[in-house]
């Protein structure tokens, strides 16, 4: 009987602690509540008069605004007459293509609902400072993934003379592997192959990328066919050069 009494006391204490913790969690304010907003997404019908609860960067609940009483949030936003959509992606961006627009691009993306971007070609010395700015604490900017420079052949199309400087030369397989090592060390998320690459350099890039677990985007090199290139890459950025 003594053992049963002890167990009952322990269970009672445990339950009391759980209830206390739940009460404290319920009272804890969330980060953001957006009220009276119209939701549009790719799966559901248009939903009006909704309250969206967000905490630690995640949506934790979507409820009817008529039932959203006593919501405790650090920030409350009235979305009456406004629309809320999932963040959009721009999968093909060149932040450093024209320096006149570089500084304004992040704000324009967010204004139009783009919250994630992939920069598909830029010299590291130009692009990395932009990435640092976009990722700095408090920056109002989309999340960015980048390839670094266009991996071109012995001749570079975007050479900074005839066109903006976005690409680098890869005259040999050895040069390509060395360039990829530098690009990978600079934090690139994927690689971008360009049009003047020869088949032997292309093969070296694919091999090195697989070794480093780096996805490949690319144009179809002028010396190759799309049917030969497509199985080796994760994305063909332009449907040409067949």
Residue ranges of each PLM-predicted region?
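Bacterial N-terminal signal peptides that target proteins for export
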Residues: 1-11
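C-terminal motif of bacterial Sec signal peptides marking the signal peptidase cleavage site
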Residues: 19-21
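Bacterial signal peptide processing site
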Residues: 23-25
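Histidine-rich, glycine-flanked metal-binding segment
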Residues: 28-30, 43-85
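Solvent-exposed loop/turn tips at the surfaces of repeat/solenoid architectures
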Residues: 36-37, 57, 209
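Short solvent-exposed capping/turn motifs at the termini of beta-strands
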Residues: 39-41
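Divalent-metal coordination cores built from histidine and acidic residues
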Residues: 79, 83-84, 88, 105-242
């Amino acid at each position: 009987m003594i053992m049963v009494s002890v167990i009952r006391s322990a269970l009672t204490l445990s339950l009391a602690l759980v209830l206390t913790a739940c009460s404290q969690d319920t009272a804890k304010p969330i980060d953001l509540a957006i009220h009276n907003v119209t939701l549009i997404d790719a799966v559901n019908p248009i939903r009006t008069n909704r309250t969206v609860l967000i905490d630690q960067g995640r949506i934790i609940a979507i409820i009817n605004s008529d039932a959203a009483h006593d919501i405790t949030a650090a920030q409350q936003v009235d979305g009456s007459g406004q629309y809320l959509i999932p963040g959009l992606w721009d999968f093909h961006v060149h932040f450093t293509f024209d320096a006149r627009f570089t500084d304004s691009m992040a704000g324009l993306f967010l204004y139009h609902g783009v919250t994630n971007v992939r920069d598909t070609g830029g010299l590291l010395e130009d692009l990395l400072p932009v990435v640092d700015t976009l990722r700095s604490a408090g920056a109002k900017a989309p999340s960015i993934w980048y390839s670094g420079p266009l991996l071109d052949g012995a001749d570079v199309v975007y050479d900074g003379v005839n066109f903006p400087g976005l690409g680098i030369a890869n005259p040999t397989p050895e040069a390509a592997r060395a360039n990829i090592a530098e690009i990978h060390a600079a934090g690139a998320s994927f690689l971008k192959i360009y049009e003047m690459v020869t088949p032997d350099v292309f093969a070296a890039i694919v091999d090195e990328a697989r070794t480093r677990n780096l996805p490949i985007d690319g144009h179809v090199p002028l010396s190759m066919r799309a049917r030969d290139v497509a199985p080796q890459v994760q994305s063909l950025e332009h449907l040409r050069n067949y």
